[in-house]
């Protein structure tokens, strides 16, 4: 009897032995820079911190979700603080500007963590978009 020829595009899933949190091990190592810009985007559901070089190229980013927080805990101030510490420690910044956007609860905690981390801040700028009577806001929640 002839052997069956294996299909090239078989859909069989092969587990290679990656850990459950494979995202952390597959992430590229961040470039080390001394001067940069820290963008803090604090929404009501999450806090995202992006570190860029002075030209605006993204070097590293971190969010409360990638730091291990799930669901409503992503919106906590502690999650914002941990996210900021994670981003700064990985890149190794010495001097930075901070751009803050949004009104979430992780905003002030992230700013406090950046200030305590030892990074010299040249300026802190609030770049939250403010409408000049633009789109209609969502209706009030009734609980």
Swiss-Prot record:
Gene Ontology CC terms: chloroplast; ribonucleoprotein complex; ribosome
Pfam families: Ribosomal_S11
Signal peptide: none
InterPro entries reported for this sequence: Ribosomal_uS11 (IPR001971), Ribosomal_uS11_CS (IPR018102), Ribosomal_uS11_sf (IPR036967)
Single Gene Ontology MF annotation: structural constituent of ribosome
Keywords: Chloroplast, Plastid, Ribonucleoprotein, Ribosomal protein, RNA-binding, rRNA-binding
Top-level lineage group: Eukaryota
Subunit structure: Part of the 30S ribosomal subunit.
Family: Belongs to the universal ribosomal protein uS11 family.
HAMAP family: Ribosomal_uS11
Name this protein carries in UniProt: Small ribosomal subunit protein uS11c
Protein's organism: Triticum aestivum (Wheat)
